[in-house]
Amino acid sequence: MPTVLNGNAIREKFLQFFESKQHRRLPSASLVPDDPTVLLTIAGMLPFKPVFMGKRERPAPRVTTSQKCVRTNDIENVGRTARHHTFFEMLGNFSFGDYFKREAIGWAWELVTGVFELPPERLWVSVYEEDEEALVLWQEVAGLPPVRVRKMGADSNFWESGPTGPCGPCSEIYYDFHPERGEGDIDLDDDSRFLEIYNLVFMQLNRDSEGTFSELPRKNIDTGLGLERMAQVLQGVPNNYETDLVFPIIRKAEVLSGRDYFKADDQQKTSFKIIGDHTRAVVHLVADGVLPGNLGRGYILRRLIRRMVRHGRMLGIAGSFLPQMATVAVELMGGAYPNLLESRELILTRLATEESQFLQTLETGERLLDEILGRSEKRISGVDAFMLYDTYGFPLELTMEVAAERGLEVDVAAYEEAMEKQRERARRAAKTVDLTQGASLADLERTDFLGYRNVASKAMVKLVLFEGEPIERASAGASVQLVLDQTPFYPEGGGQIGDRGYLSGPDLLVRIEDVQKRDTVILHTGRIERGTVATGDSVQAQIDLADRRRSQAHHTATHLLQAALKKVLGESVQQQGSLVAFDRLRFDFSWPKALSQAEIQQVEDLVNTWIAEAHTLSQEVMPIDQAKARGALAFFGEKYGSEVRVIDVPGVSIELCGGTHVRNTAEIGLFKMVSETGIASGVRRIEAVAGPAVLEYLRLRDTVTRQLADEFKVQVEQIPQRVAALTSDLKQAQKQIDSLKAALATARAEALLGQAETTGGFRVLVADLGDTEPEALKSAAEHLLAKLGEGGAVVLGSAPAADKVSLVAAFGKGAVAKGLNAGKFVGEVAKITGGGGGGRPNLAQAGGKQPEKLKNALSEASSKLSGALGA
């Protein structure tokens, strides 16, 4: 039997083995890829996609990595199968035009049988059915008998990057858990017997747009060995979750829930596994700069967190528990991924905040479920059930359980249909790493950007687009997109909007309003003011210099702002987005709470101090490794090549940046923060102005304050006191109004006491209180019940708006003991008015949308009370 190894040892032995084969070890890339076509790093090869495409220089001829990955296309299988995960580590060895099939097969076999000591008789191999070379090599190099090398079709053993581009056959190594079953009638897809542990992709072909294959001039190797799967094999456990990579997290969930994983039923075990898996995913996502949100990768993180909370509740874990789970995961993986330790506080804060908000959302979901139950006559629709699950985290089982209590059923078939549609969307989104997307302008030569040194230049028109289609020429009045051979116009990027300006020629004037970059081509969008423009024309390109100066002042000010935030708040501040415009700047950053006025003042003062110190900026192009070694900040989501531009404000800030900047900070003049707000959980936004825009802002503010002073008939400096006085008066008036409404409701209630009827020894009162607001209606019901005593039963209704009904049921102890439940009672009555609701057995509220049916609802309430209490 092979030596038992822990997960860290497996990872290290793999990397050391390939280092001994002259591979360069590289660290894991971020889960947030440079590739804008992919939300998350879903494969070990993804960071090398530009290398495989020939768009970036290879970091070395041979490379080995342990790459962290997150996939959610099979999220419903997580915890239910032995080996599905959202987070996993892919160990890989890569060759960029260096070695090929023979070496890849030989080293793979040496690794699994020599280093990891897997018995050869337990290993099977698959090859692509047309790859005779691989079939022979497995027998020659590894000594495998032909019976244990299986030919398989393109679905499983031919790798494609997309409809066109690099592709090739692949070969997989499988571990046999049950060799005693013999070698006849073998199905490598039988998960109960075989586990795929190592995949070798031989990237040797290129497919063109007509589907024709040709040999690649430089053949590549892309491999992947799943760390969790190898750990399962070497540690002799029945599934990936019980390896030392995941099980310590599950152990923490055992402690918090008071349950034993090994004594749990199947559903409880699934919940334990989901929590163990998702904890690993969420700590890495947060550490890599992902924030919970409603779009893209932010939604993926939010969904994982909500699943954790839901499965924690299913295990009986009360209250907040995510930070405790995350602490175990950070300690478990921090040795291999030090950024987890560095981001520990950020991770715990983010998860605690999101968990707290979701627990509140769950309460909202419960109220929504009450409304759905209230308007459903026989069954809850599948659409509603899926909405409860997808938006509020309600499992189908919980919805069905609550519905059954009300005598309803759930349309499970429609629910499953909605779920399958979501799964299909996820599968389509994550099916492959597409190496060909975004190549629509690839046939054009790159546009040379001259804008760092020039504000004007001559240029030749290479392409004219009208409504997205290429045309030969366009005339005055047309809105067009133009591609030039060279340009001084800065294209929108890195948060900075594109330059504006003009293209001119003999009897030609084109006003340029927007400039964008598409791959290596720069598109100038504008309107032809005069003349005609055609492909091949020579034009003079001139940017609006005043606009450029404003935008570069704002861009440099943005760098200073980030440096000031890090100095005042701490290095954990991370940029989450930015906008650099002619008239303002906007900077989004990670921070869990609003800045105090003192912190805002500190940040603003620091920026203005650095401006006044007149720092001369350094703008250099250098290799990215050199830039990072100098401490230059790089940002998630930005695409960087092997050569990068570095903006250095000496002693203040150093960042990778392709934008335009002032030469000296003194050119900015002045910086003023306009606002600081929250835009999402854990994300703050600062809006500010710099340079001439500060004067415009101050003029506008001065105009507004003078108008307010005139309106209030006070001096400008007295405005705050006047506003405070008016606010105090308004609050006092509102209190008086609320008090009068409550008094009116109480008076109405007192007047109704005489209408109370005696039924079976109980005092019953059902009444309409006109347009009384819900809170006042509730107070009136409680007041009446107190007057009627423990044998009282009160149902009140009102129509506070044209499309709104409010209902309250308040029952004394005697009525409750008789079997009445205020929550169920008022919910049933509210259905008549097109609504629903619920609450406690003794006090509950409900609402409706049809005031014209309030009378019928109250009549029904009276009848139901008579029937229940008079018996």
From Swiss-Prot:
One of its GO terms (cellular component) is cytosol. Its EC number is 6.1.1.7. Gene3D superfamilies: 2.40.30.130, 3.10.310.40, 3.30.54.20, 6.10.250.550, Bira Bifunctional Protein, Domain 2, Threonyl-trna Synthetase, Chain A, domain 2. InterPro entries: aa-tRNA-synth_II/BPL/LPL, Ala-tRNA-lgiase_IIc, Ala-tRNA-ligase_IIc_anticod-bd, Ala-tRNA-synth_IIc_core, Ala-tRNA-synth_IIc_N, Ala-tRNA_ligase, Ala_tRNA_ligase_euk/bac, DHHA1_dom. Binds 1 zinc ion per subunit. Its cofactor is Zn(2+). Keywords: Aminoacyl-tRNA synthetase, ATP-binding, Cytoplasm, Ligase, Metal-binding, Nucleotide-binding, Protein biosynthesis, RNA-binding, tRNA-binding, Zinc. Residues 834-871 are annotated as: Disordered. It catalyses: tRNA(Ala) + L-alanine + ATP = L-alanyl-tRNA(Ala) + AMP + diphosphate. Zn(2+) binds at H555, H559, C657, H661. One of its GO terms (molecular function) is tRNA binding. It is found in: Cytoplasm. GO terms for biological process: alanyl-tRNA aminoacylation. The keyword Aminoacyl-tRNA synthetase applies. Consists of three domains; the N-terminal catalytic domain, the editing domain and the C-terminal C-Ala domain. The editing domain removes incorrectly charged amino acids, while the C-Ala domain, along with tRNA(Ala), serves as a bridge to cooperatively bring together the editing and aminoacylation centers thus stimulating deacylation of misacylated tRNAs. Catalyzes the attachment of alanine to tRNA(Ala) in a two-step reaction: alanine is first activated by ATP to form Ala-AMP and then transferred to the acceptor end of tRNA(Ala). Also edits incorrectly charged Ser-tRNA(Ala) and Gly-tRNA(Ala) via its editing domain. NCBIfam families: alaS. Belongs to the class-II aminoacyl-tRNA synthetase family. This is Alanine--tRNA ligase.
